[in-house]
A protein has these predicted regions:
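N-terminal first-folded block
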Residues: 2-33, 38
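Generic, ordered loop/turn and secondary-structure boundary motif
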Residues: 5-8, 18, 44, 50-55, ...
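Hydrophobic residues in beta-strands and at strand termini
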Residues: 7, 16, 39, 50-51, ...
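Conserved SET/PR-domain catalytic core that frames the SAM/AdoMet-binding pocket
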Residues: 16, 20-26, 57, 64, ...
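Compact, glycine-rich, soluble single-domain proteins
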Residues: 29-63
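C-terminal structural segments of small proteins and small subunits
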Residues: 60-90
Length: 92
């Protein structure tokens, strides 16, 4: 079973605490919310994992903050990165 970290009940993305291979079982409980799923694809250590299914335009929330929006349909257990999420952060 692979470990993930998430800090807020509002989060719909978690961080992988080790490399995750396709099909690996992942479990997480945060603030009473329980998640259990198999990884859809390989996810490197430190990268984001989808805790829910996303539709294009859905907000991606990590550590209680909106960090971006889905650019396509994303299945729970998928790698969240620049290929399927656009950042909401603005660099000044």
């Amino acid at each position: 079973m692979k470990r993930l970290v998430s800090l807020s009940a509002e989060d719909n993305a978690a961080t992988a605490l080790s490399d995750i291979s396709p099909g690996d079982e992942c479990c997480l409980e945060v603030a009473g919310n329980k998640y259990k799923f198999n990884a859809e694809e390989g996810i490197p250590f430190g990268h984001k994992v989808a805790l829910i299914d996303f539709q294009p335009g859905d907000q991606v929330i990590k550590y209680g903050e909106i960090i971006g929006r889905a650019t396509k349909t994303i299945k729970k257990g998928s790698h969240l990165h620049i290929h399927n999420v656009v950042s909401d952060r603005v660099v000044k």
